[in-house]
Amino acid sequence: MTMAAAAVVARGAGARAATAAALRGGCGTAARGRPCAGPARPLCTAPGTAPDMKRYLWERYREAKRSTEELVPSIMSNLLNPDAIFSNNEMSLSDIEIYGFDYDYTLVFYSKHLHTLIFNAARDLLINEHRYPAEIRKYEYDPNFAIRGLHYDVQRAVLMKIDAFHYIQLGTVYRGLSVVPDEEVIEMYEGSHVPLEQMSDFYGKSSHGNTMKQFMDIFSLPEMTLLSCVNEYFLKNNIDYEPVHLYKDVKDSIRDVHIKGIMYRAIEADIEKYICYAEQTRAVLAKLADHGKKMFLITNSPSSFVDKGMSYIVGKDWRDLFDVVIVQAEKPNFFNDKRRPFRKMNEKGVLLWDKIHKLQKGQIYKQGNLYEFLKLTGWRGSRVLYFGDHIYSDLADLTLKHGWRTGAIIPELRSELKIMNTEQYIQTMTWLQTLTGLLEQMQVHRDAESQLVLQEWKKERKEMREMTKSFFNAQFGSLFRTDQNPTYFLRRLSRFADIYMASLSCLLNYDVSHTFYPRRTPLQHELPAWSERPPTFGTPLLQEAQAK
């Protein structure tokens, strides 16, 4: 569990222990099989008659409620800073000599207009080139429909959220624009678990017999929405269609928006509309250069597109900051295919046929492969830190095969942390955790009256879990959580990224010798007190950052 995934637990020392203590089970840990530090009231010290039991349970409920309300102010005093960097793995920047970057959604951020552009262009390609009904043009892009990390069952045409243990979060399964009832989902999958052989492959794709596709990058948001809209049209109009063909046609249309240059030309023609200038990319690059760090850029985007974007956000001298620039790299193939050589581009963008013996500063290279890159630069192992927004295409191979350190750029993190810092969210989550603990302890009472009370609590808990989901996204909830469990997205983020942050500008809050320490989160059989220290590194706490 990472810090963002466990922010409520991480907010203040003793918050969870105090919540557990509110349940009057002594130290609040005995119910989980953990020894109490001192004398504790037995769990079953309750009257035996039904009316007395009912009264006893509701007294415990009210006492826990009061105790929870007293906890909220202390939690509110330890809000997390949305501009902090969070660590999955201990890493010291003093060990990093070389910094690498992706381009899209790493060095440059785009406005909300870009996803509308991609959606509209792909929708029109479906109509004009794949002969889809012109009526689908009535569907517009909804930025609030989907979130990253969702899985799409290609054969059943349903979009869903899956947790780290391959379980579907019920209530987040959508066919078209309508939620699929839980009973139908359970019948469809013979439960809520998705077997490993049905999941997406290593890179999130539906290949080699896998029936699921995982949408991991930010550019996939309009693709998910378009898939859902066209599905909705066919369903509403009782049109028989093959879901596999629909998936492929939408995928090809989204790809063509990139491949045919539709997106690139539109951005270059109105760069101020599509590129957000606010992110302090130049300040980050200048800081690293001033400290003698080597820097390189590896992107799948074309040269002229990158040049115009970087000139806009960094300046026309942007290439002076980088030791190596590689465009149209075709990641993740760049990290695995040893056969493709580099090609140099001249100032006019013409590809040269010279054999590359050295990667020169100020030059732009196309394609190539990582093995040749390592040979020509000598930049190997944990001296290198590479940043990207795509967990699979940017980071997975680098950390698993080459030992590079990796940093994930997760723009959604900032908005989620701002929500998690609100009093309404903190009150709801604190009471939800307390109520869950109360249910866990009081389930030992099996008489009919007690069970009726517990059923009321379970109903309240279910309603609160739905409420916490809607804080982030009405359909799918948080990018990082499915109710109690981490999402499948977070599982991969935790595995492939040493650190993660909302944007590169977060680096400006730390010096170049800073060490990032991951929070020790308790295993189920460990004492919670071991992890309940306030984070002291960098600026994770909002109050500390404001004090500076």
Curated annotation (Swiss-Prot):
Annotated cofactor note: Binds 1 Mg(2+) ion per subunit.
One Pfam short name: 5_nucleotid
Top-rank EC class of the record's enzyme: hydrolase
Source species, domain of life: Eukaryota
Binding positions for substrate per the UniProt entry: K251, D252, S253, I254, R255, D256, V257, H258, I259
GO cellular component: cytosol; mitochondrion; receptor complex
Entry annotated with the keyword Transit peptide: no
Listed EC numbers: 3.1.3.-
Family annotation (InterPro entries): HAD-like_sf, HAD-SF_hydro_IG_5-nucl, HAD_sf, Pur_nucleotidase
Stretches the record annotates as Disordered: 528-548
Residue positions of the active site: D102 (nucleophile), D104 (proton donor)
CDD domains, per database record: HAD_cN-II
Positions bound to Mg(2+): D102, D104, D389
Tissue: Expressed in brain, placenta, skeletal muscle, pancreas, testis, uterus, and small intestine. Reduced expression in pancreatic cancer cells.
Cofactor: Mg(2+)
Molecular function terms from GO: 5'-nucleotidase activity; metal ion binding
Keywords of this entry: Hydrolase, Magnesium, Metal-binding
Family: Belongs to the 5'(3')-deoxyribonucleotidase family.
Name of the molecule in the record: 5'-nucleotidase domain-containing protein 3
Top-level taxonomy: Eukaryota, Metazoa, Chordata, Craniata, Vertebrata
Gene symbol of the encoding locus: NT5DC3
